[in-house]
Amino acid sequence: MKIVYQGIPGSYSESCAKENYSGCETIACKTFDECFDKASQDSSIRAILPESNKTTGNIGIEYLVFKHRLNIYAEHFYQINHNLLGVPGAKIADIKDVYSHAQALSQSSEFLKNNNLIANVRADTAGSAKYVSETKDKSKAAIASVLSSKIYNLDIMRSNIQDDKKNMTRFLIMGKDIFQPEYNNNMKYVTSLLFKLKSKPAALYSALSGFALNGANLIKLQSFPEKNTFSSYFFLCEVDGHIENKKIQNSLEELGLHCDDMHVLGVFNADKLREK
């Protein structure tokens, strides 16, 4: 299996892909848009994309989900353990500047504050590790993955420096073809969809009433403006259950009556860590 990810080798996206899909070929992309493009053009390619973090919230890929409408095959709740990486021989007392992605810096803010370290934002965690490795400067460090330390020959100066020791990022596996697991009443599933409402009073209230009447549990609802306007919005919605469950079917049929556009993005097994 080929899996594309945003960033450079050593990123958390690549780490998650390798841990969940043993033997997969990982391919680095400069942007999230490039990930979506590659997966849209080749059914043998999957994209692994960070969707949200338990501590710092949404990553910001929702517009690309709307734009490309790839199918979601799986979700993975991946433990993010941040590590302070320095050049060989450096000690924490030597460090002045720390480089990483804005979210990694935010998620490790207490460690940075307690050690009087200066946070410097860069595009990604693995890129920060590569930068520190290239400088060979003992006063610089990066916050990145264990994989990054191996790739860029850096020492792990301190492990698990994140504020929340149960720091999790939700990754989505997406691809071109439609696939969904067979319905089993003993399994937990998530149905993901996007929709655009008709322009009428109380449209959202009316559209969502079907979920309440049928006893279906909404677990996510986000709104995003349609391109070039603030008067029309798309909604990204996730429902607890399989689309073949009658109460989910009835809820979506009711929703469709109030929509100009509705598209199911995928049905997939709920990650075992979702309830933790």
Regions found by a protein language model. Give the residues of each.
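Domain-level signature for soluble enzymes in the chorismate/prephenate branch of the shikimate pathway
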Residues: 1-276
